[in-house]
Amino acid sequence: MQNQRIRIRLKAFDHRLIDQSTAEIVETAKRTGAQVRGPIPLPTRKERFTILISPHVNKDARDQYEIRTHKRLIDIVEPTEKTVDALMRLDLAAGVDVQISLG
């Protein structure tokens, strides 16, 4: 797997969960002898929703809600076979979305 690169993108709503998952991935990759670049924090996406509280009148009565999507990027340079095998066996938290691309 020479001259390869594995790019891992993580997304989660909870920043503690995504930091824990990135730490597990980085520790696993370093333990198997691969070079790791990152974790690189990407911009947090904030979605805001405004909802009217009253059913009929009082347009001034509103609630605002926010969902934050935290993102991290990890590059694994020159991964070995052991690295790929260990990453495939890694059990991450349920609230973390993982996208892996080879390049």
Curated annotation (Swiss-Prot):
Q: Which UniProt keywords apply?
A: Ribonucleoprotein, Ribosomal protein
Name the Gene Ontology biological process terms: translation
Q: Which GO terms describe its cellular component?
A: ribonucleoprotein complex; ribosome
What InterPro entries does its record include? Ribosomal_uS10, Ribosomal_uS10_CS, Ribosomal_uS10_dom, Ribosomal_uS10_dom_sf
Q: Member of which family?
A: Belongs to the universal ribosomal protein uS10 family.
Q: How does it assemble?
A: Part of the 30S ribosomal subunit.
Explain the purpose of this protein.
Involved in the binding of tRNA to the ribosomes.
Output this protein's name. Small ribosomal subunit protein uS10
Q: Which organism is it from?
A: Buchnera aphidicola subsp. Schizaphis graminum (strain Sg)
